[in-house]
């Protein structure tokens, strides 16, 4: 059970897309529009269409003169992501979209509609450099970081799908965004933080979602967690822990060789103290690997010690990936694990796994044509 891939923190610089409206702050948009010889208010018009109306087609923006549309479109609304295909499951309420970026890079996002909410799971990198052996994305390696606008455009597209009733249940609203698709969000720190602002700033400066409805996941990049604490955001922090002991985590989550479990939990506590937000602990339960009763007891003890009331455990039955020798724990083992964690005073629930049939569930995104 050795980690064969190296950890990669710095993505290759190749292939980044042209600049886009969603890469820029409101002031930067005005400056960009002025550089093109247009009046500054055109920036707000473009933002109103893109963020407010979820419209990326500049030719349909008839309140902008035809002569300006081509110029503004080419420079500030280039097509970043083209859908290659949609795969649906759960009677159409789970949709995985494979996207092709301008340089041919492939990435995936997943829209999940529930009775009371709609969540999009988005990618922050094409591939991932964290090399976790039970995750298809990690085993594929890292191609490159996504730009702020490539991240935001996944959310805009999902919001438009919901508004237009493309998912069964009629027209609706996108309510939640989780950075749990391809990539380690905090390894693409600046662009992810900028994307959070675009997602949460009120329209027309952004998409207008509440910060409390956004979750940013990490395998435990301690300096980046501390840096995010200082940003004064109120998004939910999710830590992919997967085991409470350093010996096994060094293999399951290779970044643990750099920052140990206790350091990660201390950084998470700092975030919880600063924001008043509960930290979500993600734990993929793997048969005979990390599902032992003593690990449940240790997990509960450590989380109670470091995070107290500011924690919730999401237990994820392992989703199968091609070529993997591991599978999910049996249900009785899972139930006993939950019972033991709760006995330590730590809330623990089993995640409703969506999209397994179309390789859209946690750890399955491989962006293959």
From Swiss-Prot:
[4Fe-4S] cluster binds at residues 128, 132, 135. Gene3D superfamilies: 1.10.150.530, Aldolase class I. One of its GO terms (biological process) is rRNA base methylation. One of its GO terms (molecular function) is tRNA (adenine(37)-C2)-methyltransferase activity. S-adenosyl-L-methionine binds at residues 183-184, 217, 240-242, 319. It is an enzyme of class 2 (transferase). It is found in: Cytoplasm. GO terms for cellular component: cytoplasm. It comes from the Bacteria. Its main location: cytoplasm. The keyword Disulfide bond applies. Its EC number is 2.1.1.192. It catalyses: adenosine(2503) in 23S rRNA + 2 reduced [2Fe-2S]-[ferredoxin] + 2 S-adenosyl-L-methionine = 2-methyladenosine(2503) in 23S rRNA + 5'-deoxyadenosine + L-methionine + 2 oxidized [2Fe-2S]-[ferredoxin] + S-adenosyl-L-homocysteine; adenosine(37) in tRNA + 2 reduced [2Fe-2S]-[ferredoxin] + 2 S-adenosyl-L-methionine = 2-methyladenosine(37) in tRNA + 5'-deoxyadenosine + L-methionine + 2 oxidized [2Fe-2S]-[ferredoxin] + S-adenosyl-L-homocysteine. SUPFAM superfamilies: Radical SAM enzymes. Binds 1 [4Fe-4S] cluster. The cluster is coordinated with 3 cysteines and an exchangeable S-adenosyl-L-methionine. CDD domains: Radical_SAM. Residues 114-357 form the Radical SAM core domain. The active site is at residues 108, 362. Keywords: 4Fe-4S, Cytoplasm, Disulfide bond, Iron, Iron-sulfur, Metal-binding, Methyltransferase, rRNA processing, S-adenosyl-L-methionine, Transferase, tRNA processing. Disulfide bonds join 121-362. Specifically methylates position 2 of adenine 2503 in 23S rRNA and position 2 of adenine 37 in tRNAs. Reaction proceeds by a ping-pong mechanism involving intermediate methylation of a conserved cysteine residue. This is Probable dual-specificity RNA methyltransferase RlmN. It comes from Saccharopolyspora erythraea (strain ATCC 11635 / DSM 40517 / JCM 4748 / NBRC 13426 / NCIMB 8594 / NRRL 2338). The gene is rlmN.
